[in-house]
Amino acid sequence: MAKSKNHTTHNQSRKWHRNGIKKPRSQRYESLKGVDPKFLRNMRFAKKHNKKGLKKMQANNAKAVSARAEAIKALVKPQAVKPKMPKGSSRKLSRLAFIAHPKLGKKIRSYMAKGRRLCQPKPKVQTKAEAKAPAKAQAKAPAQAPKGAQAPVKAP
C-alpha cells in the first residue's frame, strides 16, 4: 500500500482559476506601474497600524473632552456644601463648633436631630386585639401526646 501525501496538487489550478488569479498590485493599476511590490505590501501594513494618525486622533479627542468639561463647568453652578457630622473621638467638640457657627448653626441642628430620630430603636406597641389573639390560639390547640403514646379511643 502506498503512503498518502498530506498535500495534494490535484485540482489546485482549477481552484486558483475559480477565484481568479490576481496579478500583483503594481501590475493591476496604471497609477502603480513600476512601483516595487514589496513597498506596496509594506504600505498596506502601515495603513493598518497607522501610529501617527492614531496619536493625532487621541490628541483631538483629549481636546474635545477638555472643551466639554469646561463648557459643563460654565453651565453648572456650584451648589452649597451640606455640613457633614464627622464621626470619631472629636465629634462632641465639632458638634459644638457647628452649632455655634452663625450660618451653619440652624442647618446642623436639624440635621443632627434627624440623625438622632433615625438611629432610635422603635418600640413595638401591641394593641389589645393582638395581645389576646396569641393566647386564644394556644388554648385552642390540643395538648400533644408523648411520641410513643397511642391516641385515646372514644367509647361508643
UniProtKB/Swiss-Prot annotation:
Stretches for region 2 X 8 AA tandem repeats of A-X-A-K-A-P-A-[KQ]: 129-144
Keyword Cell division found: no
Modified residues (N6-methyllysine): K5
Domain of life of the native organism: Eukaryota
GO molecular function, one term: structural constituent of ribosome
This protein's GO CC annotations: cytoplasm; cytoplasmic side of rough endoplasmic reticulum membrane; cytosolic large ribosomal subunit; cytosolic ribosome; large ribosomal subunit; membrane; ribosome; synapse
One GO-annotated biological process of the protein: cytoplasmic translation
Sequence positions bearing N6-acetyllysine: K33
Keywords annotated in UniProt: Acetylation, Cytoplasm, Methylation, Phosphoprotein, Repeat, Ribonucleoprotein, Ribosomal protein
Biased composition (Low complexity): 134-156
Coiled coil: none
Annotated compartments: Cytoplasm
Region annotation (Disordered) ranges: 1-35, 116-156
Main location: cytoplasm
InterPro entries, per the entry: Ribosomal_eL29 (IPR002673)
Keyword tRNA processing annotated: no
Placement of Sequence repeats on the sequence: 129-136, 137-144
PTM-bearing positions, type Phosphoserine: S31
Subunit-level organization: Component of the large ribosomal subunit.
Family: Belongs to the eukaryotic ribosomal protein eL29 family.
Reported function: Component of the large ribosomal subunit. The ribosome is a large ribonucleoprotein complex responsible for the synthesis of proteins in the cell.
Protein name: Large ribosomal subunit protein eL29
Phylogenetic classification of the source organism: Eukaryota, Metazoa, Chordata, Craniata, Vertebrata
Gene: Rpl29
